[in-house]
Amino acid sequence: ITLSELEENLVLIAQNQGHKLHCIQTNAEHEIINAIHDAKLKNNISSIVINPGAFTHTSIAIRDALSGVEIPFYEVHISDINNREDFRKFSYLSDIAKKVFSGQGLKGYELALNDAIKNNLEK
């Protein structure tokens, strides 16, 4: 499955439940931070699903951005970070995430999205 196909599937899941989904992909830390800030300031986003990749283990800046916007977020990892190298087992985000989906493959994105929708409806 390609990134575009994954995003299309997730957009359909959101639409079928009466929600909108905005997808971004970037390998640039500052662009991730800008998107997080924009989620609060410009886009009225109610939840964030994020796969921070290698920034999981390195980015205090992404942690600060997510903490600062006070939007519930769901951390997704395709592989199980706890079954990888020692340096990959630490996450700067997991302790402040609403929930972590790790090791469930691409299905983790769908699980996180559905959890975000469910929690948004329970507000």
Which residues does each predicted region cover?
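Short catalytic helix/loop segments, enriched in acidic residues and glycine
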Residues: 1-15
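Aromatic/hydrophobic pocket-lining residues that form π-stacking "cages" and hydrophobic walls in ligand
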Residues: 10, 35-36, 62
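A generic structural motif
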Residues: 17-21, 44
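Short, glycine-/small-residue-rich phosphate/pyrophosphate-handling segment
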Residues: 20-23, 83-123
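Short beta->alpha linker loops
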Residues: 27-31, 53-54, 104
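Short, well-structured alpha-helical segments in soluble
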Residues: 34-43
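Mid-chain, well-packed structural core segment of small domains
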Residues: 44-82
